[in-house]
């Protein structure tokens, strides 16, 4: 009788990304930050990012790519996948996070950081021709994310702040 080998567990900190094969699962915790997962079904390889802001803007010259920024994190993942012979158009994308961590402090009409991050992720995948298979974006509170690279599944558990009537919400996406 053969036993399924337990995957190697990787935890992403903000500003990190990881590219892996089916022997890994990648986890993180998101507030206003966003994670993009990319999965290639034929090779069972994937990537996940944890970015803080959509872009670094024009204030600093781009010396090297920095995964703290959504546009650069996606470029880094696509470069690594391309090195493995995986075209971006054959990947399946999923997006998570963009929560509003301070709902009482939002000015009327202003986009919060989480909203900007989530919208940037959707735009980035669309611009690269990567289909978005599912998403769990926005809302209040933080999310715990687990990406099983062996099958492309992502578990998302949203935790609402104390004092909200929504409670916890967990989904397999």
Curated annotation (Swiss-Prot):
UniProt source species: Albidiferax ferrireducens (strain ATCC BAA-621 / DSM 15236 / T118) (Rhodoferax ferrireducens)
Entry protein name: Probable chemoreceptor glutamine deamidase CheD 2
Function: Probably deamidates glutamine residues to glutamate on methyl-accepting chemotaxis receptors (MCPs), playing an important role in chemotaxis.
EC number: 3.5.1.44
Any one Pfam family match given in the protein's UniProt record, by short name: CheD
Family the entry assigns: Belongs to the CheD family.
Keyword Hydrolase: yes
Gene Ontology molecular-function annotations: protein-glutamine glutaminase activity
Superkingdom, natural source: Bacteria
SUPFAM superfamilies, per the entry: CNF1/YfiH-like putative cysteine hydrolases
InterPro entries reported in the protein's UniProt record: CheD-like_sf, Chemorcpt_Glu_NH3ase_CheD, Cytotoxic_necrot_fac-like_cat
Keywords: Chemotaxis, Hydrolase
Entry keyword Hydrolase: yes
A Gene Ontology biological process term: chemotaxis
Reactions catalysed, as given in the entry: L-glutaminyl-[protein] + H2O = L-glutamyl-[protein] + NH4(+)
